[in-house]
Curated annotation (Swiss-Prot):
SUPFAM superfamilies: UDP-Glycosyltransferase/glycogen phosphorylase. It comes from Geotalea daltonii (strain DSM 22248 / JCM 15807 / FRC-32). Cell wall formation. Catalyzes the transfer of a GlcNAc subunit on undecaprenyl-pyrophosphoryl-MurNAc-pentapeptide (lipid intermediate I) to form undecaprenyl-pyrophosphoryl-MurNAc-(pentapeptide)GlcNAc (lipid intermediate II). GO terms for biological process: carbohydrate metabolic process; cell division; cell wall organization; lipid glycosylation; peptidoglycan biosynthetic process; regulation of cell shape. One of its GO terms (molecular function) is undecaprenyldiphospho-muramoylpentapeptide beta-N-acetylglucosaminyltransferase activity. Belongs to the glycosyltransferase 28 family. MurG subfamily. UDP-N-acetyl-alpha-D-glucosamine binds at residues 10-12, 124, 165, 192, 247, 292. This is UDP-N-acetylglucosamine--N-acetylmuramyl-(pentapeptide) pyrophosphoryl-undecaprenol N-acetylglucosamine transferase. It is found in: Cell inner membrane. It catalyses: di-trans,octa-cis-undecaprenyl diphospho-N-acetyl-alpha-D-muramoyl-L-alanyl-D-glutamyl-meso-2,6-diaminopimeloyl-D-alanyl-D-alanine + UDP-N-acetyl-alpha-D-glucosamine = di-trans,octa-cis-undecaprenyl diphospho-[N-acetyl-alpha-D-glucosaminyl-(1->4)]-N-acetyl-alpha-D-muramoyl-L-alanyl-D-glutamyl-meso-2,6-diaminopimeloyl-D-alanyl-D-alanine + UDP + H(+). It is an enzyme of class 2 (transferase). It is a peripheral membrane protein. Its main location: membrane. Signal peptide: none annotated.
Amino acid sequence: MRLIVAGGGTGGHLFPGIAVAEEFLARNSANEVLFIGTERGIEARLLPKLGYRLECISASGIKGQSPLTKVKSAALLLYGYSQSRKILKEFRPDVVLGVGGYASAPVVLSARGLQIRRFIHEQNAIPGLTNKVLARIADKVFISIEESRKFFPEDRTMLTGNPLRKEILWNVQQGKTEPKGGSLRLLVFGGSAGAHRINTAMVEALPHLAKVKEHLLITHQTGEKDHGEMKKAYGAAGFNAEVTPFIDNMAAAYAAADFIVCRAGATTLAEVAVSGKACIFIPYPYAADDHQRRNAEALLKEDAGFMILERELTGDTLAGQIIRLMQEPELVEKTAANIRKFGQLDAAQVIVDEMTGKQEPLCTEK
């Protein structure tokens, strides 16, 4: 069988698609996967490293843009649709999975025109515009959070959880070694592109953390733009910190961490949940429909995490929460146990089962 995974742009969209691709390929050595994305998205940098084939199309967002930009985006959508039809006719997939992001729309629309089975996966509590539209023509909608069900057709919506990569699941099963010298390990990241506000808050927090720096090991994914300045700041303050623009092996980073400071995107929540890590969530305030805050609140209701809203974020506030977790290991353990209950280990298997359960003829020339 052949599968196309369409979408990306950010790790939050791409990583669930990679997880499904891994499971699909593991089922049969003859299976094939093709990703379709854009040259601007994280997929263009990451997928070649992982050995996946990627085709890029033209696509852009429409929501929240100026009238002129909307016209240009609509033109790109039409061009992307034409590109997608050509790719689908050449690859001849059995199924198409849209994972959100700009590239998802023209590909799934093309799949409908070519009568190819098509599915979409929604990662967040509040769906994006692309998936809300595509749900009308999808054979089935897979959701990660029960709260999002009300936005989709009831008879074609299925709660699966958020698919996770095999390396994440493997590290969960392996556990981790004890920290050297009794130091606690803090992982800080703001998504695949970093988060400037989290970066600046950590710089502001360093003076407040000075009294505990001998007992703290920090791994910080900064993104490309802030990497140089962040590296200098940690060095000048005398912290034991690994500062990197991008962490290729997030599974190892999760496994090594004792607690985490991060955003509250759906894929991040799914990964930290199965990893069983206490987290200080700092939701991205400009996410569509404030969905990151809604994602985090679902965990806070069950004492499965901590949250600092960005409008309340200061170096002092962040440092205070970090020090609290360092000083209260029982609280860290309790929170980790609670968040682990949200982990769904079989999401990728369930999705692949559903997509391959009813095989349709290969795409034919239209």
